[in-house]
UniProtKB/Swiss-Prot annotation:
GO terms for biological process: carbon fixation; L-methionine salvage from methylthioadenosine. Catalyzes the enolization of 2,3-diketo-5-methylthiopentyl-1-phosphate (DK-MTP-1-P) into 2-hydroxy-3-keto-5-methylthiopentenyl-1-phosphate (HK-MTPenyl-1-P). This is 2,3-diketo-5-methylthiopentyl-1-phosphate enolase. The active site is at 99 (proton acceptor). Its EC number is 5.3.2.5.
Length: 414
């Protein structure tokens, strides 16, 4: 294979999957075939999309009811020649799913890149090992927290929140994705003030925390803004990839003057991936493509919290981010939304140690504040790695958290 293989889930009311697959393969490449003269067929053969797999799936009554028609469900795979497109994500996505995304109940499930095609993508600049080296933390999941309620607040409020989270043992603190450039907490001021706070905490407590600052602005200003952030001392750039596009992420990741990790936020991605019938699968969008384009971290809804993703999908995202691939470093999985200390055993069980445990309210909502919330998570992480049930741990911060949010593996009885 020298090009790319696209895998689709289709729902066809003509009940002829083979014919539908061939129509897609032709429609996204040379347009027609049987009516072409033999000589022209020979000339265009190398550009023709090739159907390489058709698999009928069991009938799904819920889908038929939803669509108000009886359809045949199937998985099809089509190979697109590398000759047909330039080696960039806009060209790849337009070739494999451009006008097809408008044509009925079709979902792009996966894209399989040839080794030759992979050479055109950067992958993560740091990856899991590089991030761990920055923090000098190699033997446990990382803990991340989020600034909360920053809109309309000044830099003093940010510094207080940051200090409390760092003292609590949080490894990474990230901006809220809806915190944009503003007069009260401008980008460079957040970075400079944040570094002062984190250096002070490190000198006092010996704990290192990184700050992920939100990179925002117009598309053609992003590189300048990123370089300004780097010059101010930014540790990590948080980026709302799907508000801008995967190619923009790749452009940032490939720039040697932006030598910091990039954290991809999934904002807007639900518009592409939420439906079971249309769009692009979450594992492809939030896993494989983010990794290829250069994200060191990928945030996505966890299977446990307030904006839950199906467990199978969440694990598939993580698989794409962390599976061995000689072409790319591994990206950190960051299952998010509604996470509290009681979920830590499940996160470690399902995602392993190479995961970032990301919490907002589960840290800030602790009765002992963000310091207590961070300490509760760190204690839960340590206990989980020691195979110790959370309810058996003698720690006031963890017990308080379990009282408030519960312990899914063992309901706390007081």
């Amino acid at each position: 294979m020298s090009g790319i293989i696209a895998t689709y889930l289709i729902h066809d009311d003509s009940h002829n999957l083979e014919k539908k697959a061939e129509q897609i393969a032709l429609g996204l490449t040379i347009g027609s075939w049987t009516h072409l003269p033999h000589l022209l067929q020979e000339q265009l053969k190398q550009h023709k999309g090739n159907v390489i797999h058709v698999e009928e799936l069991a009938e799904h009554e819920h889908t038929n009811s939803y669509l108000r028609k009886k359809v045949k469900r199937g998985i099809i795979k089509i190979e697109y020649p590398l000759l047909n497109f330039s080696p960039d994500l806009p060209a790849i996505l337009t070739t494999t799913f451009g006008k097809l995304s408008l044509d009925g109940e079709v979902k792009l499930i996966d894209l399989t890149f040839s080794d030759e095609l992979k050479k055109h993508f950067p992958g993560p600049k740091f990856g899991i090992d590089g991030i761990r080296n920055l923090l000098q933390v190699h033997d446990r999941p990382l803990l991340m927290s989020i600034f909360k309620g920053m809109i309309g607040r000044n830099i003093g409020y940010l510094k207080t929140q940051l200090r409390d989270q760092a003292i609590g043992g949080v490894d990474i603190v990230k901006d809220d994705e809806i915190l944009f450039e503003n007069a009260l907490t401008p980008l460079t001021k957040r970075i400079v003030s944040g570094k002062e706070v984190l250096q002070s905490v490190y000198e006092t407590y010996g704990h290192k925390t990184l700050y992920a600052v939100n990179l925002t602005g117009r598309t053609f200003d992003l590189k300048e803004n990123a370089k300004r952030a780097v010059q101010a001392g930014a540790d990590i750039l948080l980026f709302n990839v799907f508000a801008y596009g995967l190619d923009v992420l790749q452009s940032l990741a490939e720039d040697d003057e932006i030598p910091v990790p990039i954290m991809a936020h999934p904002a807007v991605s639900g518009a592409y991936s939420a439906s079971k019938l249309y769009g692009v699968s979450s594992p492809l969008l939030l896993g494989k493509l983010l990794r290829y384009a250069g994200a060191d971290f990928s945030l996505f809804p966890s299977p446990y919290g307030s904006v839950a993703l199906e467990k199978e999908e969440a694990l598939a995202i993580s698989k794409y981010l962390t599976e061995d691939d000689a072409s790319f470093k591994k990206s950190f999985s960051v299952p998010s939304a509604g996470i509290h200390p009681g979920f830590v055993p499940f996160i470690v069980r399902d995602f392993g140690k190479d995961v970032v445990i990301n919490a907002g309210g589960g840290i800030h909502g602790h009765p002992n504040g963000a310091q207590g919330g961070g300490k509760a998570f760190r204690t839960a992480i340590d206990a989980t790695l020691q195979n110790k049930p959370l309810h058996e741990v003698d720690d006031i911060n963890l017990h308080s958290a379990l009282q408030i949010w519960g312990n899914p593996s063992y309901e706390v009885k007081l």
